């Protein structure tokens, strides 16, 4: 089964949206196998967003993601990455369809409420930054 990482960013946590967002993913048939809340520090943010390091918005991104608590979750399921990306909507909430997380809940392109892995390969790396394998739970969903 494919796994993917979901982060509810500080704007989502601060507005009490973690539960709603996690529930939306479960309704897609994805199984929640790891969950934690944390305050991301600059070191972890730099590792997580390393592909964007050369981009002009990188510093602002790190400042934002470390500005408050986040919820980190791992979901598992068939085509988990694709399902979650579709449910999240476009990066810019103004361009996201209604019914998507960002279309319904995102504030702006900087405060777009969620992050999700963009490929199965990247998901493996991202998950390893936030969870050890022993923190991921295997169970039968009914």
Curated annotation (Swiss-Prot):
EC numbers: 2.7.4.6
PROSITE patterns, per the entry: NDPK_LIKE (PS51374)
Gene Ontology BP, a term: UTP biosynthetic process
Compartment list: Cytoplasm
Cellular component aspect of the GO annotation: cytoplasm
Chief subcellular location: cytoplasm
Keyword Kinase attributed: yes
SMART domains per UniProt: NDK (SM00562)
Binding site for ATP: 9, 57, 85, 91, 102, 112
Keywords: ATP-binding, Cytoplasm, Kinase, Magnesium, Metal-binding, Nucleotide metabolism, Nucleotide-binding, Phosphoprotein, Transferase
One Pfam short name: NDK
Catalytic residues, chain numbering: 115 (pros-phosphohistidine intermediate)
Chemical reaction(s) catalysed: a 2'-deoxyribonucleoside 5'-diphosphate + ATP = a 2'-deoxyribonucleoside 5'-triphosphate + ADP; a ribonucleoside 5'-diphosphate + ATP = a ribonucleoside 5'-triphosphate + ADP
Protein family according to the UniProt entry: Belongs to the NDK family.
Free-text function comment from the UniProt entry: Major role in the synthesis of nucleoside triphosphates other than ATP. The ATP gamma phosphate is transferred to the NDP beta phosphate via a ping-pong mechanism, using a phosphorylated active-site intermediate.
Subunit structure: Homotetramer.
Listed name of the protein: Nucleoside diphosphate kinase
Organism encoding this protein: Dehalococcoides mccartyi (strain CBDB1)
Gene designation per UniProt: ndk
């Amino acid at each position: 089964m494919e796994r993917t990482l979901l982060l509810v960013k500080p704007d989502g946590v601060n507005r009490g949206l973690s539960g709603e967002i996690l529930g939306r993913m479960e309704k897609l048939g994805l199984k929640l196998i790891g969950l934690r809340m944390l305050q991301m520090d600059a070191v972890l943010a730099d590792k997580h967003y390393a592909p964007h390091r050369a981009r002009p918005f990188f510093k602002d991104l790190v400042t934002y993601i470390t500005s408050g608590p986040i919820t980190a979750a791992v979901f598992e399921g068939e085509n988990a990455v694709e399902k979650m990306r579709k449910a999240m909507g476009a990066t810019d909430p103004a361009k996201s369809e209604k019914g998507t997380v960002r279309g319904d809940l995102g504030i702006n392109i900087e405060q777009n409420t969620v992050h999700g892995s963009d490929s199965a390969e990247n998901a493996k790396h991202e998950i390893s930054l936030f969870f050890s394998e022993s923190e991921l739970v295997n169970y039968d969903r009914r």
